[in-house]
Amino acid sequence: MVLFSLVATHADIDLETVAQLSTGASELATSALSGSPAVKGAVVLATCNRFEIYGEAPHPDDVEAARAALVAQISERTGLNEQLVSRSFNTRTGGEVSQHLFAVSSGLDSAVVGEREIAGQVRRALINAQHEGTASSGLVRLFQAASKTAKDVGAQTALGSRGLSIVSVALDLATDLSENPDWSAKKAVVFGTGAYAGATMSLLRERGCTDISVFSSSGRAEGFVATRGGKALDSDTLPAAVAAADVMIGCSGSDTRVEAEELARVRAGSAQTLIAIDLALTHDFDPAVGELDGVELLTLESVRLAAPQEQAESLAQASGIVTGAAAAFEQEREARSVDSAIVALRRHTMNVLDAEMEKVRARHGCTAAAEEVEFALRRMVKQLLHVPTVRARELASNGQQEQYIAALDALYGITVEQPAAAPAAECPVDHGRAGQAPADVRRETA
């Protein structure tokens, strides 16, 4: 089995393309596994500025077929040309897969370097895949190791010690744009009830903002504010809240967004400036709202450009931890695969021995002589297996365990089987999309 990943991020392509690629992401892994024998496991990591697919294929020769199957699935779901989809992804295999994911989980590859939110997103991606039954055992170990690496980076370095995140940088920008930087006097409207909305609520309160309203077309706003505070909005109260707001923050990423024309109508006659912070990859707010009088629009690109740089020492320490963890993961993975091969060879050899001993007993009975023959044969088999076992570990230490596995298949017809799917997660995950929102403003996903 071989791990691979398809990676599309803010570092290589524009966020609009990343958003388009992520359309239908929640069903991609399931359809890929059912549609291609080359895909034995898949975990999808979709965030505000990246869309990545981590997969497991039976053999290195199957990676290209697995990639083609995933590209075709994405093209079908998004309506994008297959060639465009293919060009948008960088393909990683072998040690590059763990090196990249560990860096991502640790915040080293984020628009805001060192941010901690991505670690939670990596954990949730695995939980989702386990719930859907698409996480192979190899992928489970990969993502668990990534989460552990992120914890080690947080505990052993100063990376992220300032608590920066995409949300915090966005709110800092909003403070700079405000005529009055005092958040205790501001009214905020938050669109969405997911993880970003929760982080936004917490950071707003840290800054002193107490007048926070939350809108969810799915009816989840009441439950959301019940545990976090704030006021739940519905389709009737949303327009008035937006009209009076100093800040509105989009955290949902639905198919429908706040249109400039509707916002202009709702805000007509307002003398105060509205800061619109769009943290959704697929845009909660029409980009044209930034052209309206009295509206300042902040986007993910604004955050990326404004994000402060981490200190070089912290980055070097974190990078060292990531590199070491990735190397250890690859060594453990190689040892695990060759262990399965050794067990398979021993099982095959002992099955042959047992079959021959059955013939001996059938002819001579369970005599002392038969026992002596069995003892001698088992000792001989043990000696014969010694060199192949040593060679297996030598090859694994050099990353050549696949050659050993291929040799077993070629010489003895032994197929080294490894589990393809991990058990489902214990906690359920809601993958549903929200319903329709009021025509006044928008629809959102909780």
Swiss-Prot record:
The active site is at C48 (nucleophile). It catalyses: (S)-4-amino-5-oxopentanoate + tRNA(Glu) + NADP(+) = L-glutamyl-tRNA(Glu) + NADPH + H(+). It is an enzyme of class 1 (oxidoreductase). NADP(+) binds at G192, T193, G194, A195, Y196, A197. GO terms for biological process: protoporphyrinogen IX biosynthetic process from glutamate. It holds the Pfam family GlutR_N. Its EC number is 1.2.1.70. The record marks H100 as: Important for activity. Gene3D superfamilies: Glutamyl-tRNA reductase, N-terminal domain, NAD(P)-binding Rossmann-like Domain. Residues 425-446 are annotated as: Disordered. Pathway: Porphyrin-containing compound metabolism; protoporphyrin-IX biosynthesis; 5-aminolevulinate from L-glutamyl-tRNA(Glu): step 1/2. Belongs to the glutamyl-tRNA reductase family. Possesses an unusual extended V-shaped dimeric structure with each monomer consisting of three distinct domains arranged along a curved 'spinal' alpha-helix. The N-terminal catalytic domain specifically recognizes the glutamate moiety of the substrate. The second domain is the NADPH-binding domain, and the third C-terminal domain is responsible for dimerization. HAMAP family: Glu_tRNA_reductase. Homodimer. During catalysis, the active site Cys acts as a nucleophile attacking the alpha-carbonyl group of tRNA-bound glutamate with the formation of a thioester intermediate between enzyme and glutamate, and the concomitant release of tRNA(Glu). The thioester intermediate is finally reduced by direct hydride transfer from NADPH, to form the product GSA. Catalyzes the NADPH-dependent reduction of glutamyl-tRNA(Glu) to glutamate 1-semialdehyde (GSA). This is Glutamyl-tRNA reductase. It comes from Arthrobacter sp. (strain FB24).
